[in-house]
Amino acid sequence: DVDRSRGLGDVYKRQAMRCSIYSCERSMAVMEEFARAEIPKGGVTEDDVWAVLHAENIKRGGEWIETRLLTSGPRTNPWFQECGPRIISENEILAFDTDLIGPYGICADLSRTWWIGDSLAPANMRESYAEAVEHIRYNTRLLKPGLHMEDLTHSLHVLQDKYQALKYSSPMHGVGMCDEWPLIAYPDRLVKNAFDAVLEPGLTLCVEALVGEVNGDHMVKLEDQGVVTNNGYETISTYPLDERLFSN
């Protein structure tokens, strides 16, 4: 059907997606450079930082950004608050989800969380970040052609109890010209037979995590994008993790 076809696409779509992701990550790098250089000077707002991503996307032939999901400090929790005029301080957390329509009209849907400061982030934030990294890495290792989507749901990494209430709406979703078919649900949100299909080579998927506690002082948002291959899954996005929050 149309949804499945959009999710799978063809070799040309996947080539365009690689271009869009590359462009997005170069734009993210400029945004990070701006944030780390300018926030410590004072007076830089969430909107100021987000505007850099917009400008860099347009410079590289991109089209638009669907959301305003960049927040800082305590405004990261709960997630889904839009960026605004809040001034970001040094030694604060900053998290974002690009939701970016880049070159060729293809979505680059990546998320990163940064600690804006020279020292290590606080221990509770590093714990959340490590949990988010493990969630994505574990779930990515599950991906292979022929795996039924409901079986995938029941095989997912389980977040710690304290992170369950605020976990993301889904750990994986299709991606193309925007968020696409399918949606891989968590077990407690599974609608039986809603996605009665198996993973196929060429299916483009985002794998993500949202980690934080109810009434906590932060949320960590991470998301990568890639494609199911003939023998597994290739993560196309390569933007580095923040070593102030995590080290391998």
Name these PLM-found stretches.
Residues 88-137, 179-248:
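Charged, cofactor-coupling segments
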Residues 128-169:
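Extended C-terminal subregions enriched in glycine
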Residues 43, 62-68, 107, 146-151, ...:
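Flexible, glycine/charged-enriched surface loops at secondary-structure junctions
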Residues 1-12:
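Single conserved hydrophobic/aromatic residue that forms the stacking wall/gate
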Residues 14, 33, 40-123, 175-194:
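Short catalytic-site patches enriched in acidic/histidine residues
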Residues 13-25:
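Amphipathic alpha-helical segments
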Residues 10, 34-46, 142-149:
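Conserved short loop/turn motifs at secondary-structure junctions
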